[in-house]
């Protein structure tokens, strides 16, 4: 069992790295707003379309079903991201790892069936 000082010594570089990453991220987001000059005019606020006047409004309505399909894609993409390492280490994780992944897949299948019955996939 690691003592507190050993634990701190092991995780201190990770904590420092995380702190520097957060600090740099915040600086990169805040500094442009503080240092830039803001000159708004009509031409800068319009969307650019290959040097021509815009043909239509850039803020057109977008069907919500595209978002549902995108969310489904993200969910099942994450499923694959969890399944690949699980399949590689299946020999070493034992029965508990197997049944926990089966439960995870069961929950995803139940969610997929629910969306299917609610008509989220019908166009």
Swiss-Prot record:
Catalysed reactions, semicolon-separated: a quinone + NADH + 5 H(+)(in) = a quinol + NAD(+) + 4 H(+)(out)
Gene Ontology terms: cellular component: NADH dehydrogenase complex; plasma membrane
Keywords of this entry: Cell inner membrane, Cell membrane, Membrane, NAD, Quinone, Translocase, Transmembrane, Transmembrane helix, Transport, Ubiquinone
Membrane topology listed for this record: Multi-pass membrane protein
EC number: 7.1.1.-
Pfam families registered for this protein in UniProt: Oxidored_q4 (PF00507)
Principal localisation: membrane
Subcellular locations according to the entry: Cell inner membrane
Top enzyme class: translocase
Transmembrane segments: 11-31, 68-88, 93-113
Top-rank taxon, per record: Bacteria
GO molecular function: NADH dehydrogenase (ubiquinone) activity; NADH:ubiquinone reductase (non-electrogenic) activity; quinone binding
The UniProt record lists the keyword Protease: no
Function: NDH-1 shuttles electrons from NADH, via FMN and iron-sulfur (Fe-S) centers, to quinones in the respiratory chain. The immediate electron acceptor for the enzyme in this species is believed to be ubiquinone. Couples the redox reaction to proton translocation (for every two electrons transferred, four hydrogen ions are translocated across the cytoplasmic membrane), and thus conserves the redox energy in a proton gradient.
Family recorded in the similarity comment: Belongs to the complex I subunit 3 family.
Subunit structure: NDH-1 is composed of 14 different subunits. Subunits NuoA, H, J, K, L, M, N constitute the membrane sector of the complex.
Stated name of the protein: NADH-quinone oxidoreductase subunit A
Source species: Rickettsia prowazekii (strain Madrid E)
Lineage start: Bacteria, Pseudomonadati, Pseudomonadota, Alphaproteobacteria, Rickettsiales
């Amino acid at each position: 069992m690691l003592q507190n000082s050993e634990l701190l010594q092991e995780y201190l570089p990770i904590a420092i790295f995380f702190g520097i990453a957060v600090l740099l991220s915040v600086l990169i987001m805040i500094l442009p707003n503080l240092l830039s000059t803001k000159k708004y005019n009509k031409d800068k606020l319009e969307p650019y379309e290959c040097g021509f006047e815009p043909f239509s409004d850039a803020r057109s309505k977008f069907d919500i079903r595209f978002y549902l399909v995108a969310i489904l894609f993200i969910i099942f993409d994450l499923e694959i991201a969890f399944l690949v390492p699980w399949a590689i280490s299946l020999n070493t994780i034992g029965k508990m790892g197997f049944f926990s992944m089966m439960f995870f897949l069961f929950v995803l299948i139940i969610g997929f069936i629910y969306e299917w019955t609610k008509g989220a996939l019908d166009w």
